[in-house]
């Protein structure tokens, strides 16, 4: 089963221009869904993505990428 990433294009802490290329680097075959995912509270202060329908958030994109990799290894 292919991995799926969901990212928000409305949340203040999410920078799609830098986040999407990093997610594609981790898994080029994953699907990436862009849109509101009703995660607005945490999305104001932390960058986040949903990895296979599970939320993953961090204060920096670098920390987020580490958490995404961990989530994918433990799936």
Swiss-Prot record:
InterPro entries per UniProt:
DUF1450, UPF0741
- Check the UniProt entry and state the signal peptide residues, or none: none
Q: Which cysteines are joined by disulfide bonds?
A: none
**Which Pfam family, giving just one, matches this sequence?**
DUF1450
> Per the similarity annotation, which family is this?
Belongs to the UPF0741 family.
The molecule here is called: UPF0741 protein Bsph_0950
Q: Which organism is this protein's natural source?
A: Lysinibacillus sphaericus (strain C3-41)
């Amino acid at each position: 089963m292919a991995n799926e990433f969901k990212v928000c294009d409305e949340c203040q802490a999410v920078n799609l221009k830098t986040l999407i290329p990093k997610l594609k680097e981790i898994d080029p075959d994953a699907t990436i869904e862009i849109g509101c995912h009703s995660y607005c509270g945490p999305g104001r202060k932390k960058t986040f993505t949903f990895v296979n329908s599970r939320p993953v958030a961090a204060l920096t994109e670098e920390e987020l990428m580490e958490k995404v990799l961990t989530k994918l290894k433990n799936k």
